Amino acid sequence: MFLEVKNVTKSIHGDVVIKNVSLCSERGRVIGLRGINGSGKTMLMRLISGLIRPTKGQVLIDGEVVSKDIPFPKSLGVLIEGPAFLDDYSAMDNLKLIAYPKGKVTEDEIKAVLSEVRLDPKSRKKYKKFSLGMKQRLGIAAAVMEHPDLILLDEPTNALDESGVDMLKDIVKKEKERGAVLIVSSHDRDILEDISDEIYDLDQGEIVRHSIKGEKRSEG
């Protein structure tokens, strides 16, 4: 398995916010996390990303343990509550700041990913003047521009109009076909059922239901 979440529990100040969660995925699959606000979707993504450490259990990527103190073993793209962009920079310049120090993405590739999310690479419009939908599109572009092995998208449809949702579906399909594992959270049943190979329903930090596309749903 490329991704393994093994019996992960997270407690904060004595409160259990993630309870004994396990899931796994091979490459080239889309995993949906579904639940209302506060159900634990974002916290689980933070645990998978290594931004925070589990109280119990392990997250493994390609057999390597992920933790706050160990560099992420494979490339990672993240949209969790939106990345921080500079207000006075354009979309193009913001992505250059992220990409160039790593040396993994060329200017042409940045232009291409901006076009994919339907933002004009030539626009000099400052980020602080972006609509919420434009900000979300830029966040998605930042998450996928390096074509990482694992992509975490937390509520990526927030602030997107219908064309934006279609754009997101196209990107998810493309990255899946490339072999990435995508974990996408949403409270929107229809969108997740459309794009996901399997869905985990969360309630109060616990998996209460697991369904695989084309199979009968199982209770957690």
PLM feature spans:
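Conserved ABC transporter NBD signature motif
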Residues: G57-F72
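The feature captures the beta-strand-to-loop junction immediately N-terminal to the Walker
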Residues: R34-I36
